Amino acid sequence: MKPLHLKLNNFGPFLKEEIDFSKIDNNELFLISGKTGSGKTMIFDAMTYALFGKASTEQREENDLRSHFADGKQPMSVTFEFQLNHRIYKVHRQGPYIKEGNTTKTNAKFDVFEMVDGKYEIRESKVISGTQFIIELLGVNADQFRQLFILPQGEFKRFLISNSREKQGILRTLFDSEKFEAIREILKEEVKKEKAQIENRYQQIDLLWQEIESFDDDNIKGLLEVATQQIDKLIENIPLLQARSKEILASVNESKETAIKEFEIIEKKTLENNILKDNINQLNKNKIDFVQLKEQQPEIEGIEAKLKLLQDITNLLNYIENREKIETKIANSKKDISKTNNKILNLDCDKRNIDKEKKMLEENGDLIESKISFIDKTRVLFNDINKYQQSYLNIERLRTEGEQLGDELNDLIKGLETVEDSIGNNQSDYEKIIELNNTITNINNEINIIKENEKAKAELDKLLGSKQELENQINEETSILKNLEIKLDRYDKTKLDLNDKESFISEIKSAVNIGDQCPICGNEIQDLGHHIDFDSIAKRQNEIKEIEANIHAIKSNIAVHNSEIKFVNEKISNINIKTQSDFSLEVLNKRLLENENALNNQRDLNKFIEQMKEEKDNLTLQIHNKQLRLNKNESELKLCRDLITEFETLSKYNNITNFEVDYKKYVQDVNQHQELSKEIEDKLMQLSQRKLIEQNNLNHYENQLETYNNDLELNEQSIEMEMSRLNLTDDNDIDEIIAWRGEQEELEQKRDTYKKRYHEIEMEIARLESLTKDKELLDSDKLKDEYELKKGKMNTLIDEYSAVHYQCQNNINKTQSIVSHINYLNQELKDQQEIFQLAEIVSGKNNKNLTLENFVLIYYLDQIIAQANLRLATMSDNRYQLIRREAVSHGLSGLEIDVFDLHSNKSRHISSLSGGETFQSSLALALGLSEIVQQQSGGISLESIFIDEGFGTLDQETLETALDTLLNLKSTGRMVGIISHVSELKNRIPLVLEVKSDQYQSSTRFKRN
């Protein structure tokens, strides 16, 4: 990731500020400088906040980032543009705030844009999803960003001096090692679950074993005394237990079957005795009922006599009823004959009236026939009258259109001849255009190669000149450096140390006298005068310091120039001069112009020919269409003439309107005549049919009357014969018998009921006598007592058998469950043994006492330390190396870092380093960390790094080494920014981002030294 542009509104001390990082050329090293509290670190906070919604340091909350001088109605926002993998993105984040005058908080906003074809297109517009998009895009979260891109103030050396637990938190975030801890927890939970399941199975086995029924049997009790943990012994005892249970069940079953047989015998005897007793009682009752039934015999015989008489008189009664019906029919037939005769007379009168109307209508028949003839002949004309009328209307228009179409057709034919003359023998040549295009492309390629080579040669000359200038500067500075070193060597440094002893010598002089023994050398003091020129010594010391400072500055300049020469050499190696044509640029441009002119001429000719061909095709099509229209016009004109001739010939009319009026009038007259004729014919037909019907009815009624008279005569003869047979003299005898008919159904029912009951009792007495014959009735009370005794014994044994059978089956089920649990338990212990061992190993129960996560983190830390030591060796002049403390214990350990001093060949605690040495180690470790994370993550693009403070603890030489390290980072293509108050850095680093504050707000600007 490489910053391009940063815009801050109401953020920290910046009310409205923009920083254009594109002014930093070639990823050069730059310094961020300013007074304390001016807002230098806020620049890093702004970049981190724009991307992740957090500050660059964990101590700063989001609310602390808003400017105290911001307008209460304006939000805090940051807009950050950056480049990642050759693609440009922009993020805009607005912080939440309570707008002045409101009580509710305005929510945060976050938008992510990507530049596509020179314009920004939105990718995300929500805070949570947008932040997640940035994390996935960069490949790091906020904590990783602080470790890789921004080394914040106060946290620069945190990773170096942190203990194992703190390092674990940092490394866990950077290398996503929580998944290994998650694996450990998963395995731990799995083992816990498996152990719980195993324990549960032991409990289930024990519970089932305790629930097995012993039947108070000593053998079973002995088998059940085995402890449930002895699962192998349980397996041995289970078959024995099941066999003994079956023996007990068989014994109980035998007793039960004997009791059932004894009960069935007494039950059968009791049932038979009860049936015999019931049959005897029923027999006695039926005999009494039979005697009572016989007493009703005389009454039943009287009823049967009446019913016989009623049956015999039935025929006579039927004849009497039939006589009445026949007499009624004769009267009705006479009435029908009279009515029918009257209807026939009325129909004859109606027919005479209609015949008169028909005669009057036939007198107009000739006139109607002539009209029908006209209608038949002209019906086809009238049905298509619109066709003939349209012909009269269109004939003149078609004559005019035909003449006009003929003129237009002649004009088009003349135009076609003109176009064909223009085309002549010319043809389009597109192959020539392709050939010319290829030639022009080749010439352009040759011209571009020549121009690129000229540009590359100019760039090469410029770079060679820059390189020569830098080498000259290095030679000049090397010469000056040698002179300064020679000048420095001329000073006698051994006498310069007395300058610091001036006050000490004065104290000794004040304490001794001439002739005393010197407390330093032991000689006698001869003189107390001034033998040392301390002013001269101080002057020489200042001269030496000035020379050393100049030497140091020249060395720094030489190092910078060497880095710049290295960068120039890389550019020179990237310059590629291609093989070019032997022709000059002028000749190629001339050939290009000639071919372009030829191409344009051929294109114009092709275009002209295509236009003429298109015009020819267009004219041909128009001529064809005109000819079709002319043919159609002539056809339509002929059709109109034929239709008019046809109309006038058939109708004898030359006016459509007159024809239509007369035709419709004739049709109306004919229709009226035909309707009236049809109506009269229909009436005559109806009258004829009605008269025929009535005549048939009259014949029918007369035949019926004759039949009824004959039936009446025969019926009277039958009545006389029946009365004679029954010895009846008059109608009174008949009436008396008829009176009995109301009681006939009741009498029949009474008779039938008596006979049915008589037969049933007779049959039942015979059945019961056969069932009780030769059988003795036993004492019911004795049988009942014996029955209850046998039944109680049987039920007791059945219940006992059911209980024993259930308990045996239950024992079998439980022993089967126990066997199933034991088999599953054995298999489970076998299957889970590897998981138990793996869980112990990843939890730290191994020869190194390390958890899986700590083992992985130690691996990454070793990689980081190895990478860091490459730079620390250079910065410490091969004195210090970082090492990981090997002493480990169970849990979080093994991540502490010590320093190994190659001078003493011993390792010591990191806190024993000086401030400058700690900075060197922290910087080397931080750079090593970022590089290892980039190697492991793959997708992270580290194109920039920013360092906040830490350089103030370095001496001049160490500062030079640190700067060389950062310059090497810059030469690898990474933008490096530093925040520092060290004045030496302002002189050494040419590009400075100044942050100025007026106690109200801050502003920034880039300047070059």
Curated annotation (Swiss-Prot):
Coiled coil regions, renumbered to chain: 176-364, 392-502, 535-802
Gene3D superfamilies per record: Helix hairpin bin, P-loop containing nucleotide triphosphate hydrolases
Binding-site residues, ATP: G34, K35, T36, G37, S38, G39, K40, T41
Gene Ontology biological-process annotations: DNA recombination; DNA replication; double-strand break repair
Entry keywords, A to Z: ATP-binding, Coiled coil, DNA recombination, DNA replication, Endonuclease, Exonuclease, Hydrolase, Nuclease, Nucleotide-binding
The keyword ATP-binding is assigned to this record: yes
Gene Ontology terms, MF aspect: ATP binding; ATP hydrolysis activity; endonuclease activity; exonuclease activity
Domain of life: Bacteria
Presence of the UniProt keyword Membrane in the record: no
Self-association state and partner proteins as the record states: Heterodimer of SbcC and SbcD.
Cited function: SbcCD cleaves DNA hairpin structures. These structures can inhibit DNA replication and are intermediates in certain DNA recombination reactions. The complex acts as a 3'->5' double strand exonuclease that can open hairpins. It also has a 5' single-strand endonuclease activity.
Assigned protein family: Belongs to the SMC family. SbcC subfamily.
Protein name: Nuclease SbcCD subunit C
Organism: Staphylococcus aureus (strain USA300)
The encoding gene: sbcC
